């Protein structure tokens, strides 16, 4: 056989089975597969076997470096489900992983916070859950780093809790607050998950529901420990501090108690949790911390995880122990070796190499068997722990029942004979406990042969026995104290005997269960002893194989050299890592220095901002003071015009004076609002300056026109008007002085000017001339004609709508027919309501005329009240015109040639016109008139029918129009951002267009009022009105009513018939 010398190191380093690099690569591969299978985008819960492999990997490498190296590369911002499952896996790693995992996760706090903030700003259901979950994880990491006495699993004894709390009341107080915050984060996550689930169906059996519910198992485990610790700490605080100081703690605990109890109750009702976890039940009410003895009644909630069922596929080993060559790479290495050195003589491999490989396989097989035996032992130990925990819970429940019985016995102090019988029964139970203690001590002796983990089980069991002995001692002391009772009431003997029998039955049942558990414990101990024997045999076989391997160590010097070379490379790599860590620490120091500098700059910027803010306040007040000074000059100039001889030839009308005075009063209200806004925000005086400018001009204009009006008025009213104008100017100047003083500005009294302005307004009303009696022969006829024409137009509109409804039934079907019928029915109802309104208004007008005309005729009454008559005519025309326009719009909508918005606008116009008609009728009506009450009811009916038209139109429009659903599934983050910006641009354009159209609508309305005020007389309007006689042909439209041209008379509107004209300033 040819011997090969000086084998290249690169060939030796690729031989599987002994290289540390190959073992590390296999470990990394296993972890990568487990992480990719556990954290994916499928909406399903994380499988337990993948999470368990990741947790075992943290124990293998004593940290979470590998986990975070793969987790950083996951595309968490792209999928909310991926982020949710990452948080779930991280929670399990924190709870069950190696203790160093906590410090490794501390380095990636910023990554966790960024993921939570990212999904918190997006409207995604899983995203909102991820935001809450990341806050919980950050709180958990901070708490356990601050309190290293508490492991991430939160499972500590009461002694460790006492040691962590210490004796300082401040530390206990702070620790309790931190545990409250911890519990709030846990409960908030559970509430967020349940809020997204539909409890009406079995969501816990669906993969989507289980994906959300799976992390709540860890939440239940955390909450049970946190609840127990907070109860202990609160009792300790109440023993040191007064109750009033801890009122806030008690309120917060009660709120958390009810939330936790509802959480446990809802989780217990779900099928998903019943097979995975045993959830404890909390008592009906929270503990009473004001009573120190209530601590003995507290029972620690115990969460039990049932034994996991065996999985179908075998778990993957952390170290490759396969007997066959790896796929791909070993074949390539063998071919390269043969091509370089040639095949060996007679065989492919050397006999020694084959023997070495067979021995390696045997060693690996024995090692795997040893690992299996260890895993089985750990599984047995976990099962025994769960049984002991269940037994502990049952014993606690039994102790509580005994305490309740003792409380009843204390209340019934007269049961001496029965208590002695109970004492004998207690001695019998004590004998049973002593026998159980002897058996437990024997079990402890057998378990001392196992590892240190078995001693922990024996310690827990002995602690339980000691608690039982203490309970028996307490029972004996209580019974001895009961012997002092002198009298016994025979009436309660039956009740005590019944309590005794129940306690005996329960005690016997618990003793039988305890004996059964002892027997099972002994059986498990025997199985563990047999496993120990098999382990010893395996170790002997391993020693024999080791001796055989030692004989072949001389031939493995070359391999040892290669290993030493690899170790040297590893040391070099470690030195490189240390250098990298040193550079990283320097970078962190530099970052901290830069942070300090930035904080200094921030403080400087804040001081500059404060100075600029003060400067802005000064500048705003300077602008306000300048505006007030300018306004004072304008008012002073207006007051001086009252004594100016050149102003004597200037005249004005009372109507114009009234309009200017009313505008000035409105400007006073605006000035008060601007003053209030300025006091709220001293940095913005724009509203106050604008209001001040407008007020000064309007007040000056009112003063000037008041003087001009007094030139044509009688002497006495003219003198009073001049005096009022001077008083208004003086009060306005006083107000301007207050605005210029920074101290008096806050107490400005705008009411100083309102009183003289109201006086000017009242004098202007008194100076108005009375209306002239014009067209005595025409006004009455015009009113009757307009009311008759309006009724006829409404009748035609009702008939036309019925014709359109018949045509729509023949021309359309389906959804369109349903929409058209609904719209036309609502229009018909509206027309009927308007017809009833017009009829009632006519009756009310007749009543007004008959009650108010006296000895005069009807024509004379209308002529005497010409303004009221013109308003009535205008309102009647507006109703008729609105009804006609509504019919036209409905016809266009049914024929699909019009817009739904036209119908809505016509409905609003009809409502406004009927309101105008009602207002015109109510002016001279008696408030107790039955016709007026019916008119008001009809007006409300018209408004309701108009609202029905609008509602049916909008619903029909939404029913017919197709609505495109927004689909964002194929859009990336960049595309979404681009479309968001484009949509914002479109929104701004539409808002600008909307503002322009609103301004145009305002100008049209202004022009409409101007034209309405400047139109001809009512007699002329009647002359140009077309005939409103109904037509017999149903296919033709009813006559089109003319839009009213006589607008309701306002105080500031003028009419040439009044004989008064606006003021004209003439200079001679």
From Swiss-Prot:
Residues 347-599 form a coiled coil. The keyword Acetylation applies. Changing residue 875 to D: Reduced acting binding. Residues 424-443, 529-549, 582-608, 1016-1060 are annotated as: Disordered. The keyword Phosphoprotein applies. Binds F-actin via the talin-like I/LWEQ domain. This is Huntingtin-interacting protein 1-related protein. It comes from Homo sapiens. The gene is HIP1R.
């Amino acid at each position: 056989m040819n011997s090969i010398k000086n084998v290249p190191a690169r060939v030796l380093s690729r031989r599987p089975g002994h290289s540390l690099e190959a073992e590390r690569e296999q470990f990394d591969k296993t972890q990568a597969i487990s992480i990719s299978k556990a954290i994916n985008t499928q909406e399903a819960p994380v499988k337990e076997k993948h999470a368990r492999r990741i947790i075992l990997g943290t124990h293998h490498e004593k940290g979470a470096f590998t986990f975070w190296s793969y987790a950083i590369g996951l595309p968490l911002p792209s999928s909310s489900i991926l982020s949710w499952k990452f948080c779930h896996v991280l929670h399990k790693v924190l709870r069950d992983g190696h203790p160093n995992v906590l410090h490794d996760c501390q380095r990636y706090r910023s990554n966790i916070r960024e993921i939570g903030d990212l999904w918190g700003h997006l409207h995604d259901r899983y995203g909102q859950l991820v935001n809450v979950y990341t806050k919980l994880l950050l709180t958990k990491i901070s708490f356990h780093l601050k309190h290293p006495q508490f492991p991430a699993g939160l499972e500590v004894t009461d002694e460790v809790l006492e040691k962590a709390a210490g004796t300082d009341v401040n530390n206990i107080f702070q620790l309790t607050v931190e545990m409250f915050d911890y519990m709030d984060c846990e409960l908030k996550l559970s509430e967020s998950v349940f809020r997204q689930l539909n409890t009406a169906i079995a969501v816990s059996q669906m993969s989507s529901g289980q994906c959300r519910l799976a992390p709540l198992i860890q939440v239940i485990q955390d909450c049970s420990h946190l609840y127990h610790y907070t109860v202990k700490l609160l009792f300790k605080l109440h023993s040191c501090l007064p109750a009033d100081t801890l009122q806030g703690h008690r309120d917060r605990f009660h709120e958390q108690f009810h939330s936790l109890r509802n959480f446990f109750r809802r989780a217990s009702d779900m099928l998903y949790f019943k097979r995975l976890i045993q959830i404890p039940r909390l008592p009906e009410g929270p503990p009473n911390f004001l009573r120190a003895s209530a601590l003995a009644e507290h029972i620690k909630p115990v969460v039990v995880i049932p034994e996991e069922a065996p999985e179908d596929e075998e778990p993957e080993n952390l170290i490759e122990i396969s007997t066959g060559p790896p796929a791909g790479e070993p074949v390539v290495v063998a071919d390269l070796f043969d091509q370089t050195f040639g095949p060996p003589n007679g065989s492919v491999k050397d006999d020694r190499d084959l023997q070495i490989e067979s021995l390696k396989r045997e060693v690996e097989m024995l090692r795997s068997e040893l690992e299996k035996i260890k895993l089985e032992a750990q599984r047995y130990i976990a099962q025994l722990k769960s049984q002991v925990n269940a037994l502990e819970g049952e014993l606690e429940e039994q102790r509580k029942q005994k305490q309740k019985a003792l409380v009843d016995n204390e209340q019934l102090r007269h049961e001496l004979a029965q208590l002695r019988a109970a004492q004998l029964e207690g001695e019998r139970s004590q004998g049973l406990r002593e026998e159980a203690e002897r058996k437990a001590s024997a079990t402890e002796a057998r378990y001392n042969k196992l590892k240190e983990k078995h001693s922990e089980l024996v310690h827990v069991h002995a602690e339980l026995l000691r608690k039982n002995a203490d309970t028996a001692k307490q029972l004996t002391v209580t019974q001895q104290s009961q012997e002092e009772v002198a009298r016994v009431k025979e009436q309660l003997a039956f009740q005590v005997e019944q309590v005794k029998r129940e306690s005996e039955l329960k005690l016997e049942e618990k003793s039988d269960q305890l004996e059964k558990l002892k027997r099972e414990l002994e059986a498990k101990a025997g199985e563990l002893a047999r496993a120990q024997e098999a382990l010893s045999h395996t170790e002997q076989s391993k020693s024999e194989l080791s001796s055989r391997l030692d004989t072949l160590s001389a031939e493995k010097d070359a391999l040892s050299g290669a290993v030493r070379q690899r170790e040297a490379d590893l040391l070099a790599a470690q030195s490189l890592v240390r250098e990298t860590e040193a550079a990283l620490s320097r970078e962190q120091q530099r970052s901290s220095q830069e942070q300090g500098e930035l904080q200094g700059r921030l403080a400087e910027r804040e001081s500059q901002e404060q100075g600029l803010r003060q400067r802005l306040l000064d500048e705003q007040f300077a602008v306000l003071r300048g505006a007030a000074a300018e306004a004072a000059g304008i008012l002073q100039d207006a007051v001086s015009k009252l004594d100016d001889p050149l102003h004597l030839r200037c005249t004005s009308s009372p109507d114009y004076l009234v309009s200017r005075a009313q505008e000035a009063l409105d400007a006073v209200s605006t000035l008060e609002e601007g003053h209030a806004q300025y006091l709220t925000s001293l940095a913005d005086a724009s509203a106050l300056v604008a209001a001040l400018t407008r007020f000064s001009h309007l007040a000056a204009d009112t003063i000037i026109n008041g003087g001009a009006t007094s030139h044509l008025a009688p002497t006495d009213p003219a003198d009073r008007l001049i005096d009022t104008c001077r008083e208004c100017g003086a009060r306005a100047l006083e107000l301007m002085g207050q605005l210029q003083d920074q101290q008096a500005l806050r107490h400005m009294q705008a009411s100083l000017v309102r009183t003289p302005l109201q006086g000017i307004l009242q004098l202007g009303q008194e100076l108005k001339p009375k209306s002239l009696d014009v067209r005595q022969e025409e006004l009455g006829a015009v009113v009757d004609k307009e009311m008759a024409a309006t009724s006829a137009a409404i009748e035609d509109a009702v008939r036309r709508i019925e014709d359109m409804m018949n045509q729509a039934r023949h021309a359309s079907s389906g959804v369109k027919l349903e929409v058209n019928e609904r719209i036309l029915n609502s229009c018909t109802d509206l027309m009927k309501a308007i017809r009833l309104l017009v009829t009632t208004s006519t009756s009310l007008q007749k009543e007004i005329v008959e009650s108010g005309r006296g000895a005069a005729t009807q024509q004379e009454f209308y002529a005497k009240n010409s303004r009221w008559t013109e308003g009535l005519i205008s309102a009647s025309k507006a109703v008729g015109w609105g009804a006609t326009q509504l019919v036209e719009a409905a016809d266009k909508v049914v024929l699909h040639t019009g817009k739904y918005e036209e119908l809505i606008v016509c409905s609003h116009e009809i409502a406004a016109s009927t309101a105008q008609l009602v207002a015109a009728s109510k002016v001279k009506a008696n408030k107790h008139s039955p016709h007026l009450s019916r008119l008001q009811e009809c007006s409300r009916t018209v408004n309701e029918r108009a609202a029905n038209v609008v509602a049916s139109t909008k619903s029909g429009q939404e029913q017919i129009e197709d609505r495109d659903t927004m689909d964002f599934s194929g859009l990336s983050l960049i595309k979404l951002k681009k479309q968001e910006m484009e949509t914002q641009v479109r929104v701004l354009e539409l808002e600008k267009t909307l503002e322009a159209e609103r301004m145009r609508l305002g100008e049209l309305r202004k022009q409409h009022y101007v034209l309405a005020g400047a139109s001809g007389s009512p007699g002329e309007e009647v002359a140009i009105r077309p005939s409103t006689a109904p037509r017999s042909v149903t296919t033709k439209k009813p006559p089109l009513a003319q839009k009213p041209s006589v607008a309701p008379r306002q105080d500031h509107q003028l009419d040439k018939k009044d004989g008064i004209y606006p003021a004209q300033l003439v200079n001679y």
